[in-house]
C-alpha cells in the first residue's frame, strides 16, 4: 500500500475541532492500515510533523432504509493523531483565529 493512499480525508466535527488545542488531529484512513503505517503516512504527507501517538477507531456500518429498500453504510476507520511537543502544526486544519 502506498503511503499517500493511507489517509483519505480529515474528519471535521465539533469534537475533532475541540481536540486541536491538545495537538490531536482526526483523519479517516484506509481500513487495512495499521498504526505504524498511519504514522509514516502522516509524517510523509506533512513536512516538519512528528507523530507521538496514533489511536484508531473502527466504525461499524449502520443499517439505513430508503422506503422499502434496506442497505448499509460503509465501514470506516478513523485515526486520532497526537503530535509531539516539538512538532509543527498541520496547516490543513486552519482555525478562524489564524485568519
Swiss-Prot record:
InterPro entries: Nucleotide-bd_a/b_plait_sf (IPR012677), Ribosomal_uL23-like (IPR013025), Ribosomal_uL23/eL15/eS24_sf (IPR012678), Ribosomal_uL23_CS (IPR001014). Keywords: Ribonucleoprotein, Ribosomal protein, RNA-binding, rRNA-binding. The keyword ATP-binding does not apply. It comes from the Bacteria. GO terms for biological process: translation. One of its GO terms (cellular component) is ribosome. GO terms for molecular function: rRNA binding; structural constituent of ribosome. SUPFAM superfamilies: Ribosomal proteins S24e, L23 and L15e. The keyword RNA-binding applies. One of the early assembly proteins it binds 23S rRNA. One of the proteins that surrounds the polypeptide exit tunnel on the outside of the ribosome. Forms the main docking site for trigger factor binding to the ribosome. Part of the 50S ribosomal subunit. Contacts protein L29, and trigger factor when it is bound to the ribosome. HAMAP family: Ribosomal_uL23_B (MF_01369_B). Belongs to the universal ribosomal protein uL23 family. This is Large ribosomal subunit protein uL23. The lineage of its organism: Bacteria, Bacillati, Bacillota, Bacilli, Lactobacillales.
